[in-house]
From Swiss-Prot:
Subunit record text: Homodimer.
Listed name of the protein: Thymidylate synthase
Family statement drawn from the similarity comment of this UniProt entry: Belongs to the thymidylate synthase family. Bacterial-type ThyA subfamily.
Binding site for (6R)-5,10-methylene-5,6,7,8-tetrahydrofolate: D184, A278
Lineage: Bacteria, Bacillati, Bacillota, Bacilli, Bacillales
HAMAP family, per database record: Thymidy_synth_bact (MF_00008)
Organism for this UniProt entry: Bacillus licheniformis (strain ATCC 14580 / DSM 13 / JCM 2505 / CCUG 7422 / NBRC 12200 / NCIMB 9375 / NCTC 10341 / NRRL NRS-1264 / Gibson 46)
UniProt pathway: Pyrimidine metabolism; dTTP biosynthesis
Catalytic activity: dUMP + (6R)-5,10-methylene-5,6,7,8-tetrahydrofolate = 7,8-dihydrofolate + dTMP
Transmembrane segments: none
Top-level division of the source organism's lineage: Bacteria
Pfam families, per the entry: Thymidylat_synt (PF00303)
Length: 279
């Protein structure tokens, strides 16, 4: 069984047993199918920690891992907010949040693409600054990226759930700590935990570092009420050994990665489970 499955099931069980309901409040989220309020059970401040001896991907259900990586490339490599660009990759997970101009506004990739840092007298964006600093100033305690920009929040189709990364270089190993203000455990968490670990592996490879720790912090950790039944089914399923992630070792530039440079080997998993989307 995988370490991720074990940590995931423990958090799900904790939410079901002791999570606090928000049904007494008006909520922003609505069910995509019928427009009624989408309520949750939630707990606060959970941490998932991995030593990177295995790839953190669920085995109790099938996770669309290529879709997760494509979304990662859209945000971190292309720094795009254009939903059509994602559609052209065959991915439609952001369609419900598409604004009239076809984008998700000033969210996610838009923030990473803003040239607000300076390297050698040239303005660069957060990703390029991070890559430069990790390579040339590894001992710094300032290796962060931030998607939560108060100046732009009102112009975002959806404020970022995963909003911050912090990177550490110790003894030649690259560690990553991720912070999510809010995480939907049925749909969001399996994608986010996997894709940010892929990001860590990509950056470690192009900069020549070994893998260190991977930590995923969650502020509001919740389950939507319509997801509880299927999550109970999922928790009872057999867990399998984690698969291996192959990343093309010939890629030495972060911007050269394509979806064809990733393979998930020996991914054994339970059947797909459907969870309704709340928007």
């Amino acid at each position: 069984m995988s370490h991720y499955d074990q940590q995931y099931n423990a958090i799900i069980q904790k939410i079901i047993e002791s999570g606090i309901s928000d049904e007494e409040y008006q909520v922003r989220t609505k069910w995509d199918s019928d427009g009624t309020p989408a309520h949750t059970l939630s707990i606060m401040s959970e941490k998932m920690r991995f030593d990177n001896s295995e790839v953190p991907i669920l085995t109790t259900k099938k996770v669309a891992w290529k879709t997760a990586i494509k979304e990662l490339l859209w945000i971190w490599q292309l720094k795009s907010n254009d939903v059509q660009v994602l559609n052209d990759m065959g991915v439609h997970i952001w369609d419900q949040w598409r604004l009239e101009d076809g984008t998700i506004g000033a969210a996610y990739g838009y923030q990473l693409g803003k040239k607000n840092r300076t390297v050698n007298g040239q303005k660069v964006d957060q990703v390029d600054y991070l890559l430069h600093q990790l390579k040339h100033n590894p001992s710094s305690r300032r290796h962060l990226t931030m998607l939560w920009n108060p100046d732009d929040l009102d112009g975002m189709a959806l404020t970022p759930c995963v909003y911050e990364t912090q990177w550490y270089v110790k003894e030649g190993k690259l560690s990553l700590e991720v912070r999510a203000r809010s995480n939907d455990m049925a749909l969001g968490n399996p994608f986010n935990v996997f894709q940010y670990n892929v990001l860590q592996r990509m950056i470690a490879q192009v900069l020549g570092y070994e893998l260190g720790e991977y930590i995923f912090n969650i502020g509001d950790c919740h389950i939507y009420t319509r997801h509880i039944d299927n999550l109970n089914i999922q928790m009872k399923r057999e867990q399998y050994e984690a698969p291996k992630l192959w990343i093309n070792p010939d890629i030495k530039n972060f911007y050269d990665f394509t979806i064809d440079d990733f393979k998930l080997i020996d991914y054994k998993h339970g059947d797909k489970l459907t969870f309704e989307v709340a928007v």
